[in-house]
Amino acid sequence: MFLAVKIPIRRFHVSYKVFESSKKSAKEVIELINSSSLSNKETFDSSSNVPEWKRQKLALKSKFKGEKWNPKKKLSRVEMDTVRLLKDKIPSLTASDLGDKFKVSPEAIRRILKSKWQPSAEEISKIEDRWKKRGIRVEEIMKKRKIWNSHIGPNGVTNTLVIGSGNNSPIHTIKKMVSNNSDDKTNTSKMDLARKKSKLELLKKTLNQ
């Protein structure tokens, strides 16, 4: 007698996206992987206990739609004044030439040249105050660098020991017991003179004999 046994057969549905990706470029494959990743599906609620760094990361991702953050360069007031001055002195310079020089778009150069805005006396005083404060900060940084360089020995090795990572952490100087060079020179010269005298005495003795 033969028994009829039914064996269940499972059929798997395989997506052809992976096979199609072999025909695509590397950039398209990376975009496909990023679009299917779990990080793209992440959402957060303002009331949930999400860390601040994660909240900021997700907010930037939703704002820039997954693109890399690449802010446009903005020229300072001094650079804007130099753009206007160059255009006045050399009218043959085009917006594209100035844009290549200052690494901005020609449209930004056109807007700077078209603008008629001039700072008031109060704004000029505020700008000068900011520059003064900036100069004070630069002087403080240079002083700190000089102090740090004074702690470095001739061989490039620091002779200071900082305990702790705070700004008010104590600094201990490492003192080296180095013999004075002048004392060493005097000692060696005395020894040389004694040797010379002993040699002369030996010569005198040999001659007298």
UniProtKB/Swiss-Prot annotation:
Residue spans crossing the bilayer: none
Cellular-component GO terms for this entry: mitochondrion; nucleus
Keyword Transit peptide: yes
Xref: InterPro entries: NGRN/Rrg9
Transit peptide start and end: 1-19
Sorted UniProt keywords: Mitochondrion, Transit peptide
Domain of life, per lineage: Eukaryota
Record's subcellular location: Mitochondrion
Family according to the record: Belongs to the RRG9 family.
Function text: Required for respiratory activity and maintenance and expression of the mitochondrial genome.
Name the UniProt record assigns to this protein: Required for respiratory growth protein 9, mitochondrial
Lineage of producing organism: Eukaryota, Fungi, Dikarya, Ascomycota, Saccharomycotina
Gene this protein is translated from: RRG9
